[in-house]
Amino acid sequence: MINLIIGERSALSQNLKKKLKNSKIISSNNFLNLKIKSKSNIIINSFYPSKQISKLEDYNEFLNQSLSILAEGLMRLNKKLINKIIYTSSSSIYGLNTQFKHADYGNRKIYAASKLLAENIVTNFSTKNKIPYTIARVFNLYGENDKFSIVSKLIDSNKNKDFFILNNNGSAIRDFISFNQVS
């Protein structure tokens, strides 16, 4: 059985490919033309890049990368050859600390809402087609090739001997998980 990992830009996808035997990474755009030839697990780790959310200007492109490609890609697959679907979602759907406002607050809410919509697309598709599925809401990932996490920012700050500004006076409590643990 092959493991098809959708989402080539992601550091998590790269780590999954290293850990999972018989796996192949496919870009989101190529997901639309994917032809499954044998029983496969589909791991969907594809979404609009998190690090670009604060700079979001083209909402049509955001929705295309986040939801349209997902829905269309699933619809085009040969349902009989799907063993299982795993969708990596985000803890962002649980909401934000409303006491701390930043410039991209609205875009983060849009990101969270679209992640929840994507979960529902996967759930409805899988249920309708009687395909086992898992929604994995991952929290604070870090690891090799990571350029976005708070952990990578702390490491870069230390390497560059820069100051690191910690919001909330350091009162926030977070759990962190490495790519290796998820893989």
What is each PLM-predicted segment?
Residues L63-L67, A103, N107-E119, S149, ...:
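Short-chain dehydrogenase/reductase
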Residues I53-E61, L96-D104, K147, G170:
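Conserved catalytic-core motifs of eukaryotic protein kinase domains, centered on the activation segment
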Residues M1-K21:
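N-terminal Rossmann NAD(P)H-binding glycine-rich loop of SDR-like oxidoreductase domains
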Residues I6, N45-P49, I85-S91, A136-V138:
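SDR active-site strand-loop-helix element
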Residues L34-S68:
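NAD(P)H-binding glycine-rich loop region in Rossmannoid oxidoreductase-like domains
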Residues A71-I110:
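Conserved Rossmann-fold NAD(P)-dependent oxidoreductase catalytic core, especially the SDR/UDP-sugar
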Residues L96, G106-T134, K159:
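Active-site Tyr-X1-5-Lys
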Residues T123-R174, F179-Q181:
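NAD(P)-dependent short-chain dehydrogenase/reductase
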